[in-house]
Curated annotation (Swiss-Prot):
It is a multi-pass membrane protein. The keyword Electron transport does not apply. The keyword Membrane applies. Keywords: Cell membrane, Membrane, Oxidoreductase, Transmembrane, Transmembrane helix. This is Uncharacterized protein MT0090. InterPro entries: ComplexI-like_HydComp (IPR052175), NADH_UbQ_OxRdtase (IPR003918), ND/Mrp_TM (IPR001750). Belongs to the complex I subunit 4 family. PANTHER family: FORMATE HYDROGENLYASE SUBUNIT 3-RELATED, HYDROGENASE-4 COMPONENT F. It is found in: Cell membrane. GO terms for cellular component: plasma membrane. Disulfide bonds: none annotated. One of its GO terms (biological process) is ATP synthesis coupled electron transport. The lineage of its organism: Bacteria, Bacillati, Actinomycetota, Actinomycetes, Mycobacteriales.
Length: 640
């Protein structure tokens, strides 16, 4: 093993571990303030680490540590260049700096460093046209989001009379509303919320898999951090319509993301849309906390805030594991198309187990990392007594339905990804020749899988982090949250659940079934090995198996009005008769409907304007001087 990949991975893990340590100090210690005046003109760099910043710093570092270990073996297989290897730890450091920033200037600097570093990593394989297209989409979307954040925070700093977060004064309701909308657009773009998600299913599949894990499990969380820090903490507690806006954006993102994931055939694209779904659930929980607090239901508001924080931890664990497992499959086969995979359970058993753990966590079912957080969210919604408030009475049942439908569709999407991609027989020679990932890649996945199991059966271990992070929200400060332990109890709601007991019961039942099956097997005669019945055909072929496309076809048909699939059927008739078919070719593709209806017309209009500007480039110096003179006249008239 060469020194370069080892050094890059070790440095990335080291930066991640350091981030975890510093983040925990910020969460459980006093607020730490560091000011370095000479690093930036006029304002300097101002670091102020509190509980909320410490939570996100520790979470980011916890993702980076196993990804760095995974990176060592991944680089050996994929041969990343020196520039990406050097930028990965810088990307992690920039992400750690974002929640530590204590001033608007420092925050904007860290945010832009994070964006530039991630763009360089997305373009690691820039020789391919798909990568260049994804990089362009990501660059445009992230810079448009940055402009919205820049304008919003500059307006906030000017109205609040300070560049530092701690020194911001009260601002009028009009400024609060404007800053809320601008920052929701900017941070929502980074979090992949609908309709600002268009970059995510393009950039994540084309980026190297360790980078995809960092972006999807850590970077998108910082979009949520921006919403929490500025909209819900510094500007909060917000009015009722803020909560309704977050509920609407979160619910739409959750449903649209999981619908696209359920019909996606590209494994990494499926996981990218799953990120949009989970960011939507977190945003929905934050909106519920804001709405409930405005109506005086502080108990459900506190539980909803805790659900959002816990789900961020769970998503970071299972999504980093899922992208690392998908990267192992890609490195072993060169494929992301589920229709060409299969049979990996025998060839890559460890990777199969790891992806299964991640898929279970993404489903939100018992024994999965996301179960407890989604259970908390549902409990907060169904126990929010509406009283005489018609808004709460209308929105909470709808929100419960959104969470339930998103969970069901997520089960379908992850069942498809695991069953089609890893079980059955190989559908291509590449899948048949697959081999298990190297030890360092398996070690990184094992760490993330261990975190998923801990969150599934013992959320007690992260309870202090969740309590302290949730308590930073004004909506959750009126009630002390103490219900997250070995048994998750909600005293104000007469609800409880014991994930550890559920795990023990399932394990005991599985052992009992295994013992009974072994006992019955011993009493039976030895089974005979006979050819598998092929329904009258000569032999079974891989074409007779379900594919990802056929698995998703019922959902595609039910939600056709939303997904807008493009379907084409071509029938080739025999020479003897046009009533007899020799071949029937069925093609279907599901593009992003929002991208086609919203972004494609905008891109077309921009291209048309660019063509008009190109025609103005005639090469005539006299015409260029006339343009300049006209511009000067316009400036003089406007500035008069």
């Amino acid at each position: 093993m060469t020194a370069a990949p080892t050094a890059g991975g070790v440095v990335t893990s080291g930066v991640g571990v350091a981030g975890v340590g510093v983040g925990l100090l910020g969460m459980f210690g006093p607020v730490r303030v560091v000011h370095v005046g000479w690093l930036l003109p006029l304002s300097g760099v101002h670091i102020e680490l509190d509980r909320l910043g410490g939570f996100f710093m520790a979470l980011t570092g916890a993702v980076a540590a196993p990804v760095g270990c995974y990176l060592i073996g991944y680089v050996r297989r994929e041969h990343l260049g020196r520039v990406p290897m050097a930028v990965v730890p810088l990307f992690v450091a920039a992400m750690l700096l974002v929640p530590a920033a204590g001033s608007v200037t420092t925050f904007l600097l860290a945010w832009e460093l994070m964006a530039i570093a991630s763009l360089i990593l997305v373009l690691s394989e820039h020789a391919r046209p798909q990568v260049r297209s994804a990089g362009l989409w990501y660059a445009v979307m992230t810079q448009l989001g940055f402009i919205a954040i820049l304008v919003g925070l500059v307006v906030l700093a000017a109205a609040g009379g300070s560049d530092r977060f701690a020194g911001l004064g009260a601002v009028c309701d009009g400024v609060r509303a404007a800053v809320f909308m601008l920052t929701l657009v900017g941070f929502g773009s980074k979090a992949g919320l609908v309709p600002l998600h268009a970059w995510l299913p393009r950039a994540h599949p084309e980026a190297p898999s360790p980078v995809s894990a960092l972006m999807s499990a850590a970077m998108v969380n910082l979009g949520i951090y921006g919403i929490v820090r500025f909209d819900l903490q510094l500007l909060g507690p917000g009015p009722r319509w803020w909560g309704l806006a977050l509920l609407a954006v979160g619910g739409t993102s959750a449903l649209y993301g999981v619908l696209q994931a359920s019909v996606a055939a590209d494994l990494k694209r499926l996981l990218a849309y799953s990120t949009t779904e989970n960011m939507g659930l977190i945003t929905l929980a934050l909106g519920a906390a804001t709405l409930f607090a405005d109506t005086g239901a502080y108990g459900p508001a506190s539980i909803a805030a805790a659900a959002a924080m816990l789900h961020m931890i769970a998503h970071a664990a299972f999504k980093s594991l899922a992208f690392m497992a998908a990267g192992s499959v890609l490195a072993a086969t060169g494929l992301r198309d589920l229709d060409l995979l299969g049979g990996l359970a025998r060839r890559m058993p460890a990777t199969t187990v790891f992806f299964g753990v991640a898929a279970l966590g993404a489903c939100g079912l018992p024994l999965g990392a996301g179960f407890v957080s989604e259970w908390l969210l549902v409990q907060s919604l169904i126990h929010a007594a509406p009283g005489h408030d018609p808004i709460v009475a209308l929105t909470t049942p709808l929100a419960v339905g959104v969470v339930a439908l998103a969970t069901g569709l997520s089960v379908a999407a992850m069942t498809k990804a695991f069953g089609i991609g890893f079980l059955a027989r190989p559908r291509s020679t590449q899948a048949e020749a697959a081999r298990e990932a190297p030890a360092s890649m398996r070690a990184g996945m094992a760490i993330a899988a261990g975190a998923c199991l801990v969150l599934a059966v013992a959320p007690l271990l992260v309870a202090p982090m969740v309590r302290r992070a949730a308590a930073t929200l004004p909506a959750a400060q009126a009630v002390k949250f103490t219900g997250l332990g070995a048994v998750v109890r909600l005293p104000a709601m007469s609800g409880s659940i014991a994930p550890g007991v559920i795990a023990a019961a399932v394990l005991a039942a599985a052992l009992a079934v295994a013992v009974l099956a072994r006992w019955r097997f011993r009493r039976r005669p030895a089974p005979a090995r006979l050819p598998l019945w092929a329904c009258g055909a000569a032999d079974l072929t891989v074409r007779m198996q379900y594919t990802a496309t056929s698995f998703a076809e019922p959902l595609q048909r039910v939600f056709g009005d939303v997904l807008r699939p493009d379907t084409d059927i071509e029938v080739t008739h025999t020479a003897e008769s046009r009533y007899m078919a020799e071949r029937i070719t069925y093609r279907t593709a599901v593009a992003d409907a929002i991208e086609q209806r919203l972004y494609t017309p905008v891109v077309g209009a921009v291209a048309a304007m660019a063509e008009l500007l190109r025609r103005a480039h005639t090469g005539s110096v006299h015409r260029y001087l006339a343009y300049g003179a006209l511009g000067v006249l316009i400036v003089l008239v406007v500035a008069r």
